[in-house]
A protein has these predicted regions:
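Calycin-type beta-barrel ligand-binding domains and close structural analogs
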Residues: 5-132
């Protein structure tokens, strides 16, 4: 059976200077919520009190000349204990029709232990947009 690699909730907050802060939240029994993008009712039992902020993993997104938003987590501030790594750097690009996520995880000796393949994972928009 396939198991999700990462179950998270992302909270986006707009800032007065035009940037967007993306905070990463975790939940207990994360695999219980696998597939909630397809079946939102899976989230009905989840309360805000159950969510935990992943300190240091915030991404500040800035609008680029292309119109997409791009940013990354602060190097050395997002802790992980997965796959022999101790720190994770996440790069994120959000455009009107796609999201691209690139992960790089390093050990205490600054050696890359794992990461997204190539240029990262690209998620394409499917379906119609609101109002169409």
């Amino acid at each position: 059976a396939q198991r999700p690699f990462r179950q998270r909730i992302y909270r986006f907050s707009s800032l007065p200077d035009g940037r967007i802060l993306m905070a990463e939240l975790t939940m207990p029994r994360a695999t219980d919520f696998a597939g909630a993008w397809r079946r939102p009712e899976l989230l009905d039992s989840l309360t805000p009190q159950q969510l935990s902020l992943r300190q240091g993993c915030e991404i500040w997104l800035t609008r680029q000349a292309s119109g997409e938003y791009a940013g990354h987590s602060k190097v050395g501030s997002c802790a992980t204990d997965f796959g022999g790594a101790t720190t994770l750097v996440q790069y994120l690009w959000i455009g009107p029709n796609s999201v691209r996520l690139l992960d790089r995880a390093y050990d205490n000796g600054a050696r890359q232990r794992w990461g997204s393949p190539g240029e990262g994972y690209v998620y394409l928009r499917k379906g119609m947009r609101r109002g169409e």
